[in-house]
Amino acid sequence: ASYRRQRQMCIRDSHRGLHYLSNLATDNYENVRSIVQKFLRAEHEEEIVFTSGTTEGINLAAYAWAMEHLKNDDEIILSIMEHHANIVPWHFLRERFGVKIKWVDCDASGNLDPQAIIDQFSDKTKLVAITHMSNVLGTVVDVKTICHEARKRGIVSLVDGSQAAVHMSVNVKDIGCDFYAITGHKLCGPSGSGAIYIKQEIQKTMRPFIGGGDMIKDVFTDKVIYNDPPMKFEAGTPGIVQTIGFGVALEYMMSIGMDNIEMYESELTLYARQKLEGLNWLNIQGKPSKKGAIFAFTLEGSAHAHDISTILDKQGIAVRAGQHCAGPLMHHMGINASCRASFAFYNTKQEVDKLLSGLELARDLLS
């Protein structure tokens, strides 16, 4: 209803006019900040910065923090499981400043040992950027252990929570990270919405990311006085409608209860895992000990993932096919492309069974 009302009122700018509609837009928009704070269990509302999604959030961290603090031969630690959004921005620093990227592999089952990450820490390590849950393997990473050890050593930590925040309860204070990025479209919200948690003490060391209206207090011919966070990192007319819709979606998920969602999905994942692993002609990528509701797979033989996906689509089953924006992981596993089925709290065991029937049809048609 909030989303529809905002659309109907011509989407007036927030933080601009003094008239009723503008003030209403501002109130509705800013209310979402407290919703995200509650969802992530951040200590301060001001630690929530709105973005267009996880990609912008991580780039904000790269441009506004990392490019101000990292120099030649400084190190960034990444896992091989990272999404391109948590890889490419760090390559920018490698290309422009000579920063070194150190990679940590997962094991054959898709597990990522936090100690393997910690063992790569050195006096030159300035940042560890790690996924909370692999968007390909479903591996749930012990980011708390990694982030707490990083803090002891003065290393900044960034967590890509795009996948994990959908499936489990997140507490950024408990994790101990400095950045935690999420995206709205995976959380039942509109595309083009998202947020990044930035710890207050880190915000104080950051320069603005994008220049324009709202991120300033005043502008002169010879200087600019920047606004305080979080406005300092939110320039121009924001995605007002998208952000309000994002807030509505988060309230909906919290009304169900993230612990309830995690419990339901754990049972569904176990059911799907038993069924899929029972197909000896189906190759499942990664079988980590702690896994979210994500399964990447190929068929035995030469069947291409795109063909499998097309056949499943004809049966009313939507899967993704390709490299899933995780090229380094796919190269590491020696796979050109795979299909990925992702389950959520609105899926059922009957739909898992339908996937199995679709896979059997694909096998018959492509063998």
Task: Go through each PLM region and give its residues.
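Pyridoxal 5′-phosphate
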Residues: 5-8, 12-367
